[in-house]
Amino acid sequence: SATSLTFQLAYLVKKIDFDYTPNWGRGTPSSYIDNLTFPKVLTDKKYSYRVVVNGSDLGVESNFAVTPSGGQTINFLQYNKGYGVADTKTIQVFVVIPDTGNSEEYIIAEWKKT
């Protein structure tokens, strides 16, 4: 269960402070999603992010600065040749664990038009 996993992690790590609640940033026109901001990310390693749109892999990028407050913005324009992603498409963002050759990754956010 999520509860048991949380306590197991608390036992092993002791203190973790993060917030991966996705804040989707709209572009111009507002029917496009240009970025995604996580309020407070883990900073123990330099994580990369994979973006997948409607099942099409747009690649992995890693050069996103962490703000002094710990937030990080993933810029979709960097993945999509300078364009945002239409909000009618499904957007999946995966965090890629460094030093695994991009082989270990976990979905961290998903946009689905409702």
UniProtKB/Swiss-Prot annotation:
<comment type="function">
    <text>Lectin with specificity for complex cell-surface carbohydrates. Possesses immunomodulatory activity, stimulates lymphocyte mitogenesis, suppresses systemic anaphylaxis reactions and edema, enhances transcription of IL-2, IFN-gamma and TNF-alpha and hemagglutinates red blood cells.</text>
</comment>
<dbReference type="Pfam" id="PF09259">
    <property type="entry name" value="Fve"/>
</dbReference>
<keyword id="KW-0007">Acetylation</keyword>
<dbReference type="InterPro" id="IPR015339">
    <property type="entry name" value="Immunomodulatory_FIP-Fve_fun"/>
</dbReference>
<feature type="modified residue" description="N-acetylserine">
    <location>
        <position position="1"/>
    </location>
</feature>
<keyword id="KW-0430">Lectin</keyword>
<dbReference type="InterPro" id="IPR036344">
    <property type="entry name" value="FIP_sf"/>
</dbReference>
<comment type="similarity">
    <text>Belongs to the fungal immunomodulatory protein (FIP) family.</text>
</comment>
<dbReference type="InterPro" id="IPR053742">
    <property type="entry name" value="Fungal_ImmunoLectin_sf"/>
</dbReference>
<dbReference type="GO" id="GO:0030246">
    <property type="term" value="F:carbohydrate binding"/>
</dbReference>
<protein>
    <recommendedName>
        <fullName>Immunomodulatory protein FIP-Fve</fullName>
    </recommendedName>
</protein>
<dbReference type="GO" id="GO:0002682">
    <property type="term" value="P:regulation of immune system process"/>
</dbReference>
<comment type="subunit">
    <text>Homodimer.</text>
</comment>
